[in-house]
Amino acid sequence: MKNIGSKAVIQALLEIDSVCVAELQPFFYTSGWASPIYLDTKGLFSDIARRSIVLNAATNLLKDFVQKKRIDAIVGIEGSGVPFAAWLADRLDMPFLYLRKRPIGWGIKAQIEGNISTNARVLVIDDVTTDAKSKVDACIALRNHGALIEDIFVLVNFDIYPQSESLLSDANLEIHSLVTWRELFAQLSLEEKLPIKKIKLIEDFNKDPITWSSSHGGVGKC
C-alpha cells in the first residue's frame, strides 16, 4: 500500500491551510526537531466537504487492506489524529481503541481505552508522522499489552528523515499514507502562494532536516 499520492487529498489539505510556515522562529516538535513548517489537519474537523474527500480516499485504500491483513481493530493515538482513526473505524465497521501517550494509573486501562484481546491484530491510524519515532513507541506500547501490529496508516508522511527507515525496520513496522510532505509541498509551490524566500527555506529543510534542525536550536539526531 505505502503511499497513493492522492491529488484530491493534497488539494483538500491545502485548501484548509494545513501547511503553517514559521515567520521568525521555527516550530519545535515534541520530539525536539526544529522545523520551518507545521502540518495542522484540524481544519478538517469542521470542513465537511474536504473531510469527506480525505476520509473517502482513506476508506477506499483501507477497506481491502484490513481484510487482507486480517485486522481486528483500529487504534487512534492520543492527539489530533484520534478523530480520523475513529471516523475510519466507523466507516470500516471495526472496533476502535484509544491509546494514551503515557499511562494514567495501572493495568491495561491505564493506557488503552476499549477492549483488546491478546494477539489481536491492530492498525494504528494517525494524521501526521514526522520521524516515525512516536509511532514506533506507540506500537511497542500496544505490543506490550499483547497486540499484534505490523502497519501504521497516516494521512501525511513527512518521509524526509533518514533515520525513519531504520527505526521502522528494526521494529518490523511499515508506514502507509495518503500523501507525503514532498507531494504536498510540490503542489503548494506550484500554486505560488508562498514568497520565494519561504520556498527556499523549506527546500533547504527538505534536503537535510537534521542539519536544519540542529542549526536552528533543535535536536540533531533521533
Where are these regions (language model features)?
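Active-site-facing substrate-recognition patch
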Residues: 1-65
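PRPP-dependent phosphoribosyltransferase catalytic core
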Residues: 2-15, 140-222
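Conserved hydrophobic/aromatic pocket- or pore-lining residues that grip, position, or stack substrates
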Residues: 32, 74, 96
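Phosphate/pyrophosphate-binding loops at sites that engage ATP/ADP/AMP, CoA/4′-phosphopantetheine
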Residues: 58-71, 139-148
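Short glycine-rich phosphate-binding loop at a beta-alpha junction
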Residues: 68-78, 153
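Conserved acidic residues
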Residues: 72, 120, 150
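Short, glycine/charge-rich flexible loops or terminal/linker lids adjacent to PRPP-binding catalytic cores
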Residues: 84-123, 131-137
